[in-house]
Amino acid sequence: MIKLKVKKGDEVVVITGKHKGKKGKILKVFPEDSKVIVSGVNVVKKHTKSNQMSEGGIITKELPIHISNIAHIDPKTGNPTKVAFKFLEDGSKVRVAKKSGEIIGKEGK
């Protein structure tokens, strides 16, 4: 299993595949499969049959995509960037955009 540099709520962009260029927030992370669900990306329609518990119909939902197909969005420039880890003076470990040096995620807010 590889070290994931993504967290729920991160802003990402799809860099390969049929959804290339789409931006969204990470809704859920599956570390065991190295996949994530991104809002508005890889949306499919699922037809469901009615039963005693729920009505039938068409449901739209997002399917997971592999983390190698996404890149973080640099908070300073808005362009795709790679992520590095850095230790601050107080000893805390944060994620940093390699292009601009800005802190990524909730740690930077």
From Swiss-Prot:
State the family named in the UniProt similarity comment for this chain.
Belongs to the universal ribosomal protein uL24 family.
One GO molecular-function entry: structural constituent of ribosome
Q: Which domain of life is it from?
A: Bacteria
Record function comment: One of two assembly initiator proteins, it binds directly to the 5'-end of the 23S rRNA, where it nucleates assembly of the 50S subunit.
Which CDD domains does this UniProt record tie to the protein? Answer: KOW_RPL26
Recorded source organism is Rickettsia africae (strain ESF-5)
Q: Which SMART domains match?
A: KOW
**GO BP annotations, alphabetical order:** translation
Key words, A-Z: Ribonucleoprotein, Ribosomal protein, RNA-binding, rRNA-binding
Q: What is this protein called?
A: Large ribosomal subunit protein uL24
What does the record note on quaternary structure?
A: Part of the 50S ribosomal subunit.
Question: What does the entry list under GO cellular component?
Answer: ribonucleoprotein complex; ribosome
